[in-house]
Curated annotation (Swiss-Prot):
EC number assigned by the record: 6.1.1.20
Predominant localisation class: cytoplasm
Protein name per UniProt: Phenylalanine--tRNA ligase alpha subunit
Oligomer and partners: Tetramer of two alpha and two beta subunits.
Natural source organism: Methylobacterium radiotolerans (strain ATCC 27329 / DSM 1819 / JCM 2831 / NBRC 15690 / NCIMB 10815 / 0-1)
Cofactor comment: Binds 2 magnesium ions per tetramer.
HAMAP family listed in its UniProt record: Phe_tRNA_synth_alpha1
Cell compartments where the protein resides: Cytoplasm
Length: 360
């Protein structure tokens, strides 16, 4: 065994025996520092003959590289071991309740909470979430959805139009989230199963209407989607959202340009002492609109109505939030009143889950 082999064996043994980074650094300095054993060998290369340097140079440089590699590897091992030890000693008991400090406590807005509740319900049924821009083209907001040129929704008194562009075309603040249905059908191939929550805009302002409001729509496109499937989806949603064991629903024939046939859906309820309860009583309350996707809409999205079909539905998020949580006026939703939010808002850790009930 040569002197280099002996030195390498000793140095690697010292590296492996280093129990912490301080000890390892001491070994590194003793071997590779300015006055280290390997550094001293490198200095001898200058006094060697060319033949000796050609023979000894690669051996000494190889020794240096192997020692440096061993030091780096050992440093990584020690760092990982130190991290594991620290994590084990600093483990947090996540079962402990969160300490609340009322003076700094924030609240989740009811709209955000209800959107999360709706998302949890439909995710359990296999729906994905789709989103789109608030500013839309006339084509996506109206034409592709089978709105005729003279439809009242295209008038200034019902829709917010932006200034015309260079071509004289005007974009709009979307009046519904339906343009995202068009975008989805054009971008994806069936089967499609999505919900589309988001902001929408219309000229309207009173106790139950605001110029900006929130809506969630659902879209299912498949080869065999039918009204029976639509009815089941809506019943399951209403039971889960209002947290009742059963609901009675009635479908009233209606008209929407983008669905055929179309229906408005009422849900059974009772009104007692100013409180609305669902799943009981002899009264009815309109809750949403729905229908089978119109063949013209499928064609406008590049789909063959003879090969696929589907259904869609739309629910006002603000409205069902008011109904579920007993909020009499829609306008405070958007007034940024911290007192109102402290009363109607939700704690940050009130994450909706179907396991223990949405509001458990």
């Amino acid at each position: 065994m040569t002197d280099l082999d002996t030195l390498e064996r000793d140095l690697l043994a010292q590296v492996g025996a280093a129990s912490d980074e301080a000890a390892l650094d001491a070994v590194r300095v003793a071997a590779l520092g300015k006055k280290g054993s390997v550094s001293d060998l490198l200095k001898t290369l200058g006094s060697m003959t060319p033949e000796e340097r050609k023979e000894r140079g690669p051996l000494i440089n190889g020794l240096r590289d192997r020692v440096q590699g061993a030091v780096t590897a050992r440093k990584t091992e020690l760092a990982e071991a130190a991290l594991e030890a620290r994590l084990a000693s600093e483990r947090v008991d996540v079962t402990l309740p969160v300490r609340e400090a009322p003076e700094v406590r924030g609240r989740i807005h009811p709209i955000s909470q209800v959107i999360d509740e709706i998302t949890a319900i439909f995710a359990d049924m296999g729906f994905a979430v789709a989103e789109g821009p608030d500013i839309e083209t006339d084509e996506l907001n109206f034409t592709a959805l089978n709105f005729p040129p003279g439809h009242p929704a295209r008038e200034m008194h019902d829709t917010f139009f932006l200034a015309p562009d260079r071509d004289g075309k005007r974009k709009v603040l979307r009046t519904h989230t339906s343009p995202v249905q068009v975008r989805t059908m054009r971008a994806q191939t069936p089967p499609i199963r999505v919900i589309i929550p988001g902001r929408t805009y219309r000229h309207d302002s009173d106790q139950t209407h605001t110029p900006m409001f929130h809506q969630v729509e659902g879209l299912v496109i498949d080869t065999s989607a039918n009204i029976a499937n639509l009815k089941w989806v809506l019943e399951e949603f209403c039971k889960a959202f209002f947290e009742v064991d059963g609901v009675k629903m009635r479908f009233r024939p209606s008209f929407f340009p983008f669905t055929e046939p179309s229906a408005e859906v009422d849900i059974q309820c009772s009104r007692k002492g100013g409180e609305i309860r669902f799943g009981e009583g002899d009264d009815w309350l309109e809750i949403l609109g729905c229908g089978m996707v119109h063949p013209n809409v499928l064609r406008n999205c590049g789909l063959d109505p003879d090969a696929v079909q589907g259904f869609a539905f739309g629910v006002g998020i603000d409205r069902i939030a008011m109904l579920k949580y007993g909020m009499p006026d829609l306008r405070p939703f958007f007034e940024a009143d911290v007192r109102w939010l402290d009363h109607y808002g939700f704690r940050p850790l009130d994450v909706p889950s179907l396991v223990g009930g949405l509001t458990a």
